[in-house]
C-alpha cells in the first residue's frame, strides 16, 4: 500500500509558498539527485530545475545557472532541502511578472550591495561589547575594512553572544558549541540556536536560513546584526524601564497611549520633545530625510548638553561641515560610534536611529522628579506577569510568520483587525476575503469593526471557541479575549503542522492527548523513567522530563553533565533555561521563557512538547523520503498512527 507523508519545512513562511503537491515533487527531485550524486550542490540545481514543468519554456539550463550564480556563487557548496526550495523561488521570481515585491526581496539576493559604513558601525559595536568575551578574544577586534565579520559569524558563536548582549539570558551559553574546531553538525546547531533565539527576541528572520549564515551572505548577516543591535539600543524605550518618559505625555494624551507606542516611535517622540523645548520649529518624523541637514541634531545636542552648547553648528551652511561639527559635539558625550558626517548627509536611517538611541542612553534629559500625572505610572506599567509574558510570546510568534505588519504591542496593534487578518492568512492561506478587508490607516471605527468581525468569522470556521465574542471586543482591546484568541490560533497552527504529517492516514486529527502520549512513549522507549500525567503536571517544573524527551529524539543534543536534579529553585531555573536553548539548538522555534516551565504554564508546555514532536517526526519523514513510495509501512506512519492507541486518555 502506498503511503503519503506531508512535507514540512521549519520556516512557516517558506512552507506557505508551496502546495503539498509542489513540495512532494520538489522533495522527490531533491532526494533523487542526492541519491544519484551522494549530495546535492549548487552545480546540480540548473539541470534539475530546467527539467521541471514550471520552468519549461521560460528558462534553459544556462539561464538558470546565471540566475543562481548571483545568489549562490559557490557552486561546490552543499545544498539542504530548504535552500533547494529557496533557490527554486529565486529562479521563479525571475520568471513571474506577477511575483510580489516581498517575494523578490526576501527570497533572492539580486542587486544587494553592502553599505560599508553600516558594516563598520556594526563592527565597532561588536568590538566594543564583545571585547572581553573569552571565546572570541583571539578574533577581536574585527577589522572593519575587511570581510572578517562575515567569516566570523559562520559558526554562530558571535551571533549567539551578541543576542545575549541585546537581551541578557536569552541563550543558555552552556548550550553553545564553543570548541575551536566545530564539525558541520555542531555549526548547524549553533546557527539554529542563533536564528531561533533571534526570533524569540523579536527579529524577523523569515528570509534567513542557517545556510545563509554559514555562507556569510553579507546583506543577510548585516540585516540580522542590525536587528539585534536595534533591539539592544531600544530596550529602555518603555515606561517600565524608564518611567521618566511619562514626561512626554501631552495634555490631550494619556499614559496608556504613550505605552502603546513602538520603541522607535517613542524615540522620535522623545527627540521632538527636546527639539520643541529648544526652539526647533520642525517636526522630525523619520531618521533619514528629516535629519540630513544636521540642524535637528544641533538643537538636540544643545538641549541635552547645555554645558557644550554652541551656536557655531547652526551658523554653518554646508551640510557636511555641519554634520562634522555635530559629531564633534556628540563625541563629548561619547556618542560617535555609529555615525559619520556622510551618514548624516545621506540620511542613513539605520545608523541615524542607532545614533539617536545612543544619545538617549547616555543622556535622556528627562527629569527625575515625579511628574504631575493623575495616575500612578507604576500602576500603569505593572501588569500581571503571566499576561505580559503571554503577550511577548504571541507578539514574537506573530512576527516570526512573516506578515507584512510588524507587531510592537499586541494589545494595541491588533485592534483594527488588519494584523490578525494578515496572521490568519499566513496560518490558513485563503481564509481571508481581502475584498472585504479595510487596510490601515483606518479612521472610521466601524471599518475597524468590519475587519474584527471577519477575524471572528474565520476563527469560528477554524472551530475556535468564541462564544459570545464579537469583533467589537477585539477593537476595544479586551486583553483576556485577545490572549485566548491568539492561544487558539497558535495551537491551531501547531496542530495543523502535525496533522500534515499524518495526512496519509484515515484516523482522527492529532489532539493534545496524542502529543502527551507520544512524548511519554518516546521517553519510556529511550530507557528513561520520567512520565508526565498532563501538561499541568507540577513535576514538569524540574525540567527532567523535557530534557529526557529532547535526549530521546536526539541523544547527542543534551549534555547530561550540565543537568541538575532540579530539587532547588536555582537548579530548576538552570534546567529550564537549558531546555529552551537545547530545543532551539535542535531546530524548534519556540517563544516561551524559563518562568513558563518553572510555573508549568499548561499552554506553553503543550507548545514545547508539540514543537519537539514536530521536529522528531519531520526528521524521520526526511529520512524516509529516500525510500520508495511502495514501502509498506514507514516508521513515521506507524508512530503517528499509534498516537491514539494508548490505553486511557490523559488529562492535558
Swiss-Prot record:
Its main location: cytoplasm. This is Fimbrin-4. The gene is FIM4. Interacts with F-actin. It is found in: Cytoplasm, Cytoskeleton. One of its GO terms (biological process) is actin filament bundle assembly. Residues 623-652 are annotated as: Disordered. PROSITE patterns: CH (PS50021). PANTHER family: FIMBRIN-4, FIMBRIN/PLASTIN. Residues 116-233, 261-364, 388-494, 509-617 form the Calponin-homology (CH) domain. Cross-links actin filaments (F-actin). Stabilizes and prevents F-actin depolymerization mediated by profilin. May regulate actin cytoarchitecture, cell cycle, cell division, cell elongation and cytoplasmic tractus. One of its GO terms (cellular component) is cytoskeleton. The lineage of its organism: Eukaryota, Viridiplantae, Streptophyta, Embryophyta, Tracheophyta.
Amino acid at each position: 500500500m502506498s503511503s503519503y507523508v506531508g512535507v514540512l519545512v521549519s520556516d512557516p513562511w517558506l512552507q506557505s509558498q508551496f502546495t503539498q503537491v509542489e513540495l512532494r515533487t520538489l522533495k522527490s527531485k531533491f532526494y533523487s539527485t542526492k541519491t544519484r550524486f551522494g549530495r546535492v550542490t549548487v552545480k546540480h540545481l540548473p539541470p534539475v530545475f530546467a527539467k521541471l514543468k514550471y520552468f519549461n519554456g521560460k528558462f534553459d539550463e544556462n539561464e538558470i545557472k546565471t540566475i543562481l550564480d548571483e545568489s549562490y556563487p559557490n557552486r561546490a557548496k552543499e545544498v539542504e532541502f530548504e535552500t533547494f526550495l529557496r533557490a527554486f523561488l529565486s529562479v521563479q521570481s525571475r520568471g513571474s511578472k506577477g511575483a510580489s515585491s516581498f517575494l523578490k526581496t526576501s527570497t533572492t539576493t539580486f542587486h544587494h550591495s553592502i553599505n560599508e559604513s553600516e558594516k563598520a558601525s556594526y563592527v565597532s559595536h561588536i568590538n566594543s561589547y564583545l571585547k572581553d568575551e573569552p571565546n572570541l578574544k583571539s578574533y577581536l577586534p574585527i577589522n572593519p575594512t575587511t570581510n572578517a565579520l562575515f567569516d566570523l559569524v559562520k559558526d554562530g558563536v558571535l551571533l549567539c553572544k551578541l543576542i545575549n548582549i541585546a537581551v541578557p539570558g536569552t541563550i543558555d551559553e552552556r548550550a553553545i558549541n564553543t570548541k575551536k574546531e566545530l564539525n558541520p553538525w555542531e555549526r548547524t546547531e549553533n546557527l539554529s540556536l542563533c536564528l531561533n533565539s533571534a526570533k524569540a527576541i523579536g527579529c524577523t528572520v523569515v528570509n534567513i536560513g542557517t545556510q545563509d549564515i554559514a555562507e556569510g551572505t553579507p546583506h543577510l548577516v548585516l540585516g540580522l546584526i542590525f536587528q539585534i543591535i536595534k533591539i539592544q539600543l531600544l530596550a529602555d524605550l518603555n515606561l517600565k524601564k524608564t518611567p521618566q518618559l511619562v514626561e512626554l505625555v501631552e495634555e490631550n494624551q494619556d499614559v496608556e497611549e504613550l505605552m502603546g507606542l513602538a520603541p522607535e516611535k517613542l524615540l522620535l517622540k522623545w527627540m521632538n520633545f527636546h527639539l520643541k523645548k529648544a526652539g526647533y520649529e520642525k517636526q522630525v518624523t523619520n531618521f533619514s530625510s528629516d535629519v540630513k541637514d544636521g540642524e535637528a541634531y544641533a538643537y538636540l545636542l544643545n538641549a541635552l548638553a547645555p554645558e557644550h552648547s554652541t551656536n557655531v553648528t547652526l551658523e554653518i551652511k554646508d551640510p557636511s561641515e555641519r554634520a562634522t561639527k555635530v559629531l564633534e559635539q556628540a563625541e563629548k558625550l561619547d556618542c560617535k560610534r555609529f555615525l559619520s558626517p556622510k551618514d548624516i548627509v545621506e540620511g542613513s536611517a539605520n545608523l541615524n536611529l542607532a545614533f539617536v538611541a545612543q544619545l538617549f542612553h547616555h543622556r535622556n534629559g528627562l527629569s527625575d522628579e515625579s511628574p504631575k500625572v493623575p495616575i500612578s505610572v507604576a500602576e500603569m506599567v505593572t501588569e500581571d506577569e503571566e499576561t505580559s509574558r503571554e503577550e511577548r510570546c504571541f507578539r514574537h510568534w506573530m512576527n516570526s510568520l512573516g506578515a507584512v505588519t510588524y507587531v510592537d504591542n499586541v494589545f494595541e496593534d491588533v485592534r483594527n483587525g488588519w494584523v490578525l487578518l494578515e496572521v490568519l492568512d499566513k496560518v490558513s492561506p485563503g481564509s481571508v476575503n481581502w475584498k472585504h478587508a479595510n487596510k490601515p490607516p483606518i479612521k472610521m471605527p466601524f471599518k475597524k469593526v468590519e475587519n474584527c468581525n471577519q477575524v471572528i468569522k474565520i476563527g469560528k470556521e477554524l472551530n475556535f471557541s468564541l462564544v459570545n465574542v464579537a469583533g467589537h471586543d477585539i477593537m476595544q482591546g479586551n486583553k483576556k479575549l485577545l490572549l485566548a484568541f491568539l492561544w487558539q490560533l497558535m495551537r491551531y497552527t501547531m496542530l495543523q503542522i502535525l496533522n500534515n504529517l499524518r495526512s496519509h492516514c484515515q484516523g482522527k486529527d492529532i489532539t493534545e492527548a496524542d502529543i502527551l502520549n507520544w512524548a511519554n512513549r518516546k521517553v519510556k522507549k529511550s530507557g528513561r523513567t520520567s512520565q508526565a500525567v498532563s501538561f499541568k503536571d507540577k513535576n514538569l517544573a524540574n525540567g527532567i522530563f523535557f530534557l529526557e524527551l529532547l535526549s530521546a529524539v536526539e541523544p547527542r543534543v543534551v549534555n547530561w553533565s550540565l543537568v541538575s536534579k532540579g530539587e532547588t529553585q536555582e537548579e530548576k531555573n538552570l534546567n529550564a533555561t537549558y531546555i529552551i536553548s537545547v530545543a532551539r539548538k535542535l531546530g524548534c522555534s519556540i517563544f516561551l521563557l524559563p518562568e513558563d516551565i518553572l510555573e508549568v504554564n499548561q499552554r506553553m508546555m503543550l507548545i514545547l512538547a508539540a514543537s519537539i514532536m514536530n521536529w522528531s517526526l519531520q526528521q524521520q519523514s526526511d529520512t524516509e523520503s529516500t525510500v520508495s513510495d511502495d514501502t509498506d509501512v514507514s516508521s513515521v506512519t506507524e508512530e503517528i498512527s499509534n498516537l491514539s492507541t494508548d490505553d486511557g486518555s490523559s488529562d492535558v
